[in-house]
UniProtKB/Swiss-Prot annotation:
PANTHER family, sorted: GLUTAMYL-TRNA GLN AMIDOTRANSFERASE SUBUNIT B MITOCHONDRIAL AND PROKARYOTIC PET112-RELATED (PTHR11659), GLUTAMYL-TRNA(GLN) AMIDOTRANSFERASE SUBUNIT B, MITOCHONDRIAL (PTHR11659:SF0)
Protein's job: Allows the formation of correctly charged Asn-tRNA(Asn) or Gln-tRNA(Gln) through the transamidation of misacylated Asp-tRNA(Asn) or Glu-tRNA(Gln) in organisms which lack either or both of asparaginyl-tRNA or glutaminyl-tRNA synthetases. The reaction takes place in the presence of glutamine and ATP through an activated phospho-Asp-tRNA(Asn) or phospho-Glu-tRNA(Gln).
NCBIfam families for the chain: gatB, PRK05477.1-2, PRK05477.1-4, PRK05477.1-5
Name listed for the protein in its UniProt record: Aspartyl/glutamyl-tRNA(Asn/Gln) amidotransferase subunit B
Pfam assignment, any one: GatB_Yqey
Enzyme class: ligase
Gene: gatB
């Protein structure tokens, strides 16, 4: 048998850090990159006698996320203790939601909305701390301990690493649009565990799955799933059996490695958290949060196509990232969507890609580009000169108005002035005039070029064409 004879089955458990200034059960801050152990309260350190106090903002963000994926909101959920020992888990247990999660039965669409990936549940839980290993010592940083996570659990509906990657991108897009998670995988605020198994094509039974922990980039998700699927296929084709293990992905070697044998839920001895009351959510609260949801990416894309006449490809590019969509929205407040799309996707994206920076870090903000488009639309400068101004704006950060003034780039629209220039060019090139009149109409471009050369590109193309047509007959 070959790889083509096997089907890969994948389910993802995505850990999304809630965009909250404080932790799930304490008032400690959640800023990234601070000094070790500087954002730790007595609750986070599990000092005796301390009690958790629920951060209700995190509840609202979980509800918001559930509504964004058309899920059911559990009107009465509660927290449980997941018991296990690890050096960076001060309590000796994690507060999570095992029996009654806050969100159930959602869906995310991939493959151009043609395939539905079911979401089994979203529950809130605490993050653990971080172990920092040196040669002979291990240090523990509790800054991350107690940070609120949403664990978003998909059903095993994914069938390839490419689908898993697209699912992660789509989920991250939704989270960023609603603002419940910043989706920054480099900072660890979005990561996932991948449950991978294989089965013969046509089989409905699931194979033995292995869980690959803590994948923190789309590229690693793809590499880890591809390697693990191939590893399992080789074992099965050689007559072996798959052991249900928890794995780590070695990014240097590009291989999965056994971390430990996979535990069952009974190993964690779950029981209800005695220090927290059940979380009761009214329908009025759910309706209020639903009414405050922003326009989601799929809705925005359809609006751009149906109402603004943008083609599907450009609409997809613009809505793929919330910051890009916000930038575009600022442009179309004053300008036609066609000119806005061109300057955003061609001019700005071209320079951003070349400079290897994202739109958030762009030296040209939306209001600055909008001002430049004002000058092009009202004829102050030509589109060609607009690109020169744009380049200077990108390099210096100066506004278009200042550059136009400093460079003396205002378009010449005075008919008499342009007529005088054209008369001089026509008189100096009578041979070309005769050739043009005898049928060599391509010479028209020569005369336009001479006018632009004489005016350093500042002559209004419309006025030039009008006067030149009269002169050449």
């Amino acid at each position: 048998m070959t790889k083509e004879n096997w089907e890969t089955v994948i389910g993802l458990e995505v850990h999304a850090q809630v965009s909250s200034k404080t932790k799930l059960f304490s008032s400690s801050l959640t800023e990234f990159g601070t000094e070790h152990n500087t954002q730790v309260s007595l609750v986070d350190a599990a000092m005796p006698g301390t009690l958790p106090i629920l951060n209700y903002f995190c509840i609202e963000q979980a509800i918001c996320t559930g509504l964004a994926i058309s899920a059911e909101i559990n009107k009465c959920s509660y927290f449980d203790r997941k018991n296990y020992f690890y050096p960076d888990l001060p309590q000796g247990y994690q507060i999570t939601q095992f029996f009654e999660p806050i969100v159930k039965n959602g869906k995310v669409f991939i493959n151009n909305n043609e395939k539905e990936i079911r979401i089994a549940r979203i529950h809130l839980e605490q993050d653990a701390g971080k172990s920092i290993h040196e040669e002979s010592k291990t240090y523990v940083d509790l800054n991350r301990a107690g940070v609120a996570l949403m664990e978003i659990v998909s059903e095993p509906d994914l069938r390839s690493s490419a689908e898993a990657a697209e699912f992660m991108k789509k989920l991250r897009q939704i989270l960023r649009y609603i603002g419940s998670c910043d989706g920054d995988m480099e900072k660890g605020s979005l990561r996932c565990d991948a449950n991978v198994s294989v089965r013969p094509n046509g089989s409905s039974a699931f194979g033995t799955r292995c869980e690959i922990k803590n994948l923190n980039s789309i590229r690693y998700i793809v590499q880890a799933i591809d390697y693990e699927a191939q590893r399992q296929i080789k074992i099965l084709e050689s007559g072996g059996e798959i052991s249900q293990d928890t794995l780590l992905f070695d990014v240097t070697l590009g291989k999965t490695k056994v971390m430990r044998s996979k535990e069952d839920s009974s190993d964690y001895r779950y029981f209800p958290e005695p220090d927290l009351l059940p979380v009761e959510i009214s329908q009025d609260k759910i309706d209020s949060i639903k009414s405050s949801l922003p326009e989601l990416p799929d809705q925005k894309k359809l609006r751009y196509i149906n109402e603004l006449g943008i083609n599907e490809y450009d609409a997809d590019v613009i809505t793929s990232d919330k910051a890009t969509a916000d930038y575009f929205e600022e442009l179309i407040k004053k300008h036609d969507s066609k000119i806005a799309v061109t300057w955003l996707t061609v001019e700005l994206f071209g320079r951003l890609n070349k400079a290897n920076i994202d739109i958030v870090s762009s030296p040209i903000k939306a209001d600055a580009l909008s001002e430049l488009l004002d000058f092009i639309v009202d004829g102050t400068i030509s589109a060609k000169l607009g690109k020169q101004v744009f380049d200077i704006m990108f390099e210096t950060g100066k506004p278009a108005s200042l550059i136009i003034e400093e460079q003396d780039l205002k378009q010449i629209t005075d008919r008499d002035q342009i007529s005088e220039i054209i008369d001089t060019i026509v008189n100096n090139n009578q041979d070309k005039v005769q050739e043009y009149k005898s049928g060599k109409t391509k010479l028209y471009g020569f005369f336009v070029g001479e006018v632009m050369k004489s005016t350093k590109g500042k002559a209004s193309p419309d006025v030039v064409n009008l006067v030149l047509s009269e002169r050449l007959g």
